[in-house]
Amino acid sequence: MAQYKGTMREAGRAMHLLKKRERQREQMEVLKQRIAEETILKSQVDKRFSAHYDAVEAELKSSTVGLVTLNDMKARQEALVRERERQLAKRQHLEEQRLQQERQREQEQRRERKRKISCLSFALDDLDDQADAAEARRAGNLGKNPDVDTSFLPDRDREEEENRLREELRQEWEAQREKVKDEEMEVTFSYWDGSGHRRTVRVRKGNTVQQFLKKALQGLRKDFLELRSAGVEQLMFIKEDLILPHYHTFYDFIIARARGKSGPLFSFDVHDDVRLLSDATMEKDESHAGKVVLRSWYEKNKHIFPASRWEAYDPEKKWDKYTIR
């Protein structure tokens, strides 16, 4: 059998190198496991935040039955958003606590390994100290390289500047949006009871459909007896064959460039309905006059044209192709 013929010092050094490689391998495994856990956590957080507003929208639809006022709709939406954000923050806090506990356990394990290693001979301890000092010097020298890109590292000043710019842009956008909402526009409509009675009314772009109907009703009551005892909740506004909810604003349709079956909702210049013209082969840029009808009239005549074409407005449904059927 072959025997090792080196000195005791060389044997001790060989043993020290073997133990050092074993420690490095264990540290590498711990680091890989930590990176994998943090990656999984980040992907879970991203998924939760991407589904946040979809979940709020679904909850809002399921909890809203019938016609509601604009204030009620906004209050429900804000309450759902706050509750959803609170749940997400609580989950994230629990996940961070779990990761912190795991890091503490890893630190305790490393301290335990160091305590066991300290039981070795003084010669091996000296070699360990020298090796650790050399590694620390090398790491320190590498960390001070001025040519290394550190833009990805946390920087409080840079983050504060970015937050300030982001807030300025948000305020500027809010001011621009409020300015657009405050602009006046003229809406041409027909009170529809089987035939059209053309009227116009001026509203702000930030007004809701309900506010528009209230203003239109004031002008129609003196000419139509059936409207003198009617309330706004008994009226419907049909635009491009879509029944528009009372809580939507004209700004919503304009900014979304929404379309109906027979034309755009956002453009309120009016022309004659192409279905009443001899040539309906080309779409015009303007939109048709909307129709204001009593809900009772619609229920009695919804199987007859043109009411048979009408359907509830759905922001998720796209009418990319022009249709007059």
Curated annotation (Swiss-Prot):
What processes in GO biological process is this protein linked to?
chromatin organization
Alphabetical GO CC annotations of the entry are: intercellular bridge; midbody; nucleoplasm; nucleus
Q: What induces the gene encoding this protein?
A: Imprinted. Promoter methylation of the maternal allele may restrict expression to the paternal allele in placenta.
A Pfam family assignment: XAP5
Provide the family line: Belongs to the FAM50 family.
Which residues are recorded as modified (N-acetylalanine)? A2
Q: Which gene encodes it?
A: FAM50B
Q: From the Swiss-Prot or TrEMBL record, give the protein name.
A: Protein FAM50B
- How would you summarize where this protein is expressed among tissues? Widely expressed. Mostly abundant in testis and adult and fetal brain.
Q: Which UniProt keywords apply?
A: Acetylation
Q: What's the domain of life for this entry?
A: Eukaryota
Region of interest called Disordered, as start-end residue ranges on this chain: 92-111, 137-160
Q: Species name for this entry?
A: Homo sapiens
Q: Which PANTHER family match?
A: PROTEIN FAM50B, XAP-5 PROTEIN-RELATED
